[in-house]
């Protein structure tokens, strides 16, 4: 299975005020592959990621998953749901009144897991990041790095088929950033997901299978 991006164009506005943000984007990402998107501010990275996540419609072009359109106008496809896409953002966006374990279990239950299944998976994921002793604390009791690790495991909670990450390490120091990207890569490889991450940090490029460079809405050679 692969994610295939064909001739994606995105314009904002109309007439004289129209801005062309994406200008014919083409690439493929295979199952189990971890790809980094890089480019200057305004190059179209976040717009592209938002389209891939089904949160924004392209002006023209097609995104295919397993040879079928990723989303139609109702944001549905034959074999992929919005729940099958995991998002990781620069900020953790944890729910302040939920304990760490609950941040994950609620995601699992919403995806159809039983309470027991959800709890078992959440504990295992939190063990993987060394937070098994923090299950019952609240977000304000966590460090910035711990919050981001919880947010990342939350994205993997329901075994998504695609992971989209937008600058998930921007607020972290070099050591923590490396650990976060290693963690993301490991999950993508182990679960054979499709992973796409935006980052400006060239030190992290070595963890990607491939780096796609965007400039002025186009992929550079």
From Swiss-Prot:
Binding annotation for ATP: 39-46
Job description of the protein: Part of the ABC transporter complex hrt involved in hemin import. Responsible for energy coupling to the transport system.
Protein known as: Putative hemin import ATP-binding protein HrtA
Subcellular location as annotated: Cell membrane
CDD domains: ABC_MJ0796_LolCDE_FtsE (cd03255)
Superkingdom of this protein's organism: Bacteria
Family under the similarity heading: Belongs to the ABC transporter superfamily. HrtA family.
PANTHER family linked to this entry: HEMIN IMPORT ATP-BINDING PROTEIN HRTA-RELATED, IMPORT ATP-BINDING PROTEIN
Pfam family, one: ABC_tran
Keywords: ATP-binding, Cell membrane, Membrane, Nucleotide-binding, Translocase, Transport
Entry's Gene Ontology molecular function annotations: ATP binding; ATP hydrolysis activity; transmembrane transporter activity
Subunit: The complex is composed of two ATP-binding proteins (HrtA), two transmembrane proteins (HrtB) and a solute-binding protein.
GO cellular component terms, semicolon-separated: plasma membrane
